[in-house]
Amino acid sequence: MANNIYHYYVEGDDEKKVIDTLKTSMQLIISGKVDVFNVIERKFTRNQIMRLKQGTIVVLVFDTDTNQVDTLLENILFLQKQPIVKKVICVPQVKNLEDELLRSCNIKQIKELTGSKSNSNYKHDLIQHKNLSNALKTHGFNIEKFWCKDPS
């Protein structure tokens, strides 16, 4: 695994912040480049793929709170056909990042994680958070409960 190149595609800046934290300061997931690209709504292009290094493992992180899967399926098939892509890994968030964090931390409301005044401020506060790894640890983050629920 140490020689593999990983490239994460995530839905938004909040997912990017969480993945960057999990792979760097917390060292809970494999390191790799992280780009914001909503694979449920947008299609990959050849130009995007040309920027990848040979043998890249592509990790798609996406919400499951939508029934629109056609573009996602097209993206998976497109990536699987690219010789530069070694493997495609899908990480469904059930139903979204907030639900994943609620499930994997000892919190009742998402605002508790960031100390936000309201749940609606959570995303902004998470993205701006200076020490997310500490906040996750303080609230008992359990990686084994994160991204583990079956989306069915």
How would you label these PLM feature ranges?
Residues A2, K16-G32, K43-V59, T64-S152:
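C-terminal accessory helical subdomains adjacent to catalytic cores in phosphodiester-
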Residues I5-K16:
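N-terminal beta1-alpha1 ligand-phosphate binding loop
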Residues Y6, K33-V36:
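Conserved helicase/translocase motor-coupling segment
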Residues V10-E11, F37, Q93:
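Small/polar loops that bind or transfer phosphate-bearing groups
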Residues N38-R42:
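Nucleic-acid-processing active sites and adjacent nucleic-acid-binding tracks
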